[in-house]
Amino acid sequence: MNKTYDAIVIGGGHAGIEAAYALAKRAFNVALITLNINRLAMLPCNPSIGGSAKGIITREIDALGGMQGYFADLAMIQIKMLNTSKGPAVWSLRAQIDKEKYCQIILDDIKKQSNITLIEDEVVDLIVNENQCHGVVTKENGNISAKVVVMTTGVYMNSRILRGTDIKYDGPDGEKTSSSLSKNLMKYGFEILRLKTGTPCRIYTDSIDFSKVEKEQLDKNELSFSSHSNVKLDEQTCCFLTHTTAKTKEIILNNLDKSSLYSGIIIGIGPRYCPSVEDKIVRFQEKETHHIFFEPETAKGDIMYINGLSTSMPESVQDQMIASIPGLEKARVQKYGYAIEYDAINPLNLYKSLESKTLSNFFSAGQPNGTSGYEEAAAQGLIAGINAANKLDKMPMMEIKRSSAYIGVLIDDIVTKGTNEPYRMLTSRAEYRLLLRNDNVDERLSQYAFENKMISAQSYNKVLDKYKLINNEIQKLKDEYVSSNSELAKKYNVTSGVSKLKLLANPAVDPKDILGNDFPYLDEITIQVRLFGYLKKQESAAEKMFRLEKLKLPIDLDYNLVENLATEARQKLNQIKPTTIGQASRISGINPADIQMLMYYLNNRKK
């Protein structure tokens, strides 16, 4: 077996797959070391990709040359656009995925990649010399050397599965866990966090009484995540809606002392925005019911994922809870819900490139950085992979602005503010969310992708041509006026002197009446025109912030030398080592007076 590679990726989950593909796309030889090569990119938590904000992240991954959206399209059994009753800033795709097909597609495809080598093994330590990472130590194959290492271990570091007092030292779904790596990371200066997540039970579909639940109504559509998958679903697989009952609430409250979460067995901190059912019952006791969704795990549909019933209760209590829910009175359980605790590193140790501040050539991505979700993991894996490749190519690190992508918001948040709970992306976290829409990911990110060798010149020019066509059409509409005796004027009560552009800006107007059925980018141009004033305001605000991002801070700056800084500011700046004034301004506890002192200090240094 080869023992030397350009790059090593530790872990074959969603982050690891993106990192490996990014490095391979850049023509580097990659060793992808994972505990089970037949379980690549598992979907152990839920059988879906996307969701509010998350779907936009998957689209951003695609625009940057990543793979998640492409593979999701190939394995999806349902897709829909969320939040369509609201403004386009929060429209986001969500797809139900055939979880077995998804893993198989990725395994088959990765085996075709000549410069990715799959190695089934456990990484137990790093090879480190003078604060530089030079490879990994594995349990079965010993030392494997590389110029860069990307850690994407998911929830597998020192993980344990909990149901009541029943504890198993396993990874998700009974997979192996990695018991040594996080312990060894501490000796290289990493602070280890203990976090928690969970998953609900799975039920055999033929044991569900569907007469007691509500079937989701879905229209056929031509939606997809990827711009190059060319996949359109012929048929949508439906989900179903039911709810907890007063009996469910009673069972949970009477058995709280048996929950791993409430009995004190769990020490890890769980995700705030994805609570267990017992957590929901306790926190929202005024509510008598909570929504429960049945989601098929595969195209076969023989197993249902019971969304909304995540729990760490013992199996006997779960049986009672399940039987109290309409439609599940006689349900047969395929797998019980559980909580999982795992180790992660403090992401304040990382630069925006996702390279460690204390261990050169070592990058980290995904859940070991304190985030939750397949989409957040894949996004970080892609950025870490691109920047690891940039390091090998001696190119500048790629740092995506907050005003350019949710991915930029995600990474800036975790490396600037840190986290003590699994971080989930929300639209509310983005101050420029009108700019970060589902429809314009290619416009926002294609230049990043092209400059970092992730898409071809042909692909990049195709995007430039698209927006040139849109801008030309906008100018044309601006110059064309609606004739007072035209059908258009009669339909919309238009008097003379109204341009077609102004008419298109009216939400009551059907864009096809102005642009026809054949204009290829109907949604994009309509959104641009109707949000024009709001977009200009956000672009102006983003530009002001970007001026602060241009003011670089030296990595080796000793903030004890900066006069008149508050003590808290001095401590946090020395810990986080922000790279720009803009990043420094977003650290909690840093106030405007501290920023003024920093800028004054920088100006004096230049003199």
From Swiss-Prot:
<comment type="subunit">
    <text>Homodimer. Heterotetramer of two MnmE and two MnmG subunits.</text>
</comment>
<feature type="binding site">
    <location>
        <begin position="270"/>
        <end position="284"/>
    </location>
    <ligand>
        <name>NAD(+)</name>
    </ligand>
</feature>
<dbReference type="GO" id="GO:0050660">
    <property type="term" value="F:flavin adenine dinucleotide binding"/>
</dbReference>
<comment type="function">
    <text>NAD-binding protein involved in the addition of a carboxymethylaminomethyl (cmnm) group at the wobble position (U34) of certain tRNAs, forming tRNA-cmnm(5)s(2)U34.</text>
</comment>
<keyword id="KW-0274">FAD</keyword>
<feature type="binding site">
    <location>
        <position position="367"/>
    </location>
    <ligand>
        <name>FAD</name>
    </ligand>
</feature>
<dbReference type="InterPro" id="IPR047001">
    <property type="entry name" value="MnmG_C_subdom"/>
</dbReference>
<dbReference type="Pfam" id="PF21680">
    <property type="entry name" value="GIDA_C_1st"/>
</dbReference>
<dbReference type="InterPro" id="IPR044920">
    <property type="entry name" value="MnmG_C_subdom_sf"/>
</dbReference>
<feature type="binding site">
    <location>
        <position position="123"/>
    </location>
    <ligand>
        <name>FAD</name>
    </ligand>
</feature>
<dbReference type="InterPro" id="IPR020595">
    <property type="entry name" value="MnmG-rel_CS"/>
</dbReference>
<feature type="binding site">
    <location>
        <position position="178"/>
    </location>
    <ligand>
        <name>FAD</name>
    </ligand>
</feature>
<protein>
    <recommendedName>
        <fullName>tRNA uridine 5-carboxymethylaminomethyl modification enzyme MnmG</fullName>
    </recommendedName>
</protein>
<dbReference type="GO" id="GO:0030488">
    <property type="term" value="P:tRNA methylation"/>
</dbReference>
<keyword id="KW-0520">NAD</keyword>
<keyword id="KW-0963">Cytoplasm</keyword>
<dbReference type="InterPro" id="IPR026904">
    <property type="entry name" value="MnmG_C"/>
</dbReference>
<dbReference type="Pfam" id="PF13932">
    <property type="entry name" value="SAM_GIDA_C"/>
</dbReference>
<dbReference type="InterPro" id="IPR049312">
    <property type="entry name" value="GIDA_C_N"/>
</dbReference>
<comment type="similarity">
    <text>Belongs to the MnmG family.</text>
</comment>
<dbReference type="InterPro" id="IPR040131">
    <property type="entry name" value="MnmG_N"/>
</dbReference>
<dbReference type="InterPro" id="IPR036188">
    <property type="entry name" value="FAD/NAD-bd_sf"/>
</dbReference>
<dbReference type="InterPro" id="IPR004416">
    <property type="entry name" value="MnmG"/>
</dbReference>
<dbReference type="Pfam" id="PF01134">
    <property type="entry name" value="GIDA"/>
</dbReference>
<dbReference type="GO" id="GO:0005829">
    <property type="term" value="C:cytosol"/>
</dbReference>
<keyword id="KW-0819">tRNA processing</keyword>
<keyword id="KW-0285">Flavoprotein</keyword>
<dbReference type="InterPro" id="IPR002218">
    <property type="entry name" value="MnmG-rel"/>
</dbReference>
<dbReference type="GO" id="GO:0002098">
    <property type="term" value="P:tRNA wobble uridine modification"/>
</dbReference>
<feature type="binding site">
    <location>
        <begin position="11"/>
        <end position="16"/>
    </location>
    <ligand>
        <name>FAD</name>
    </ligand>
</feature>
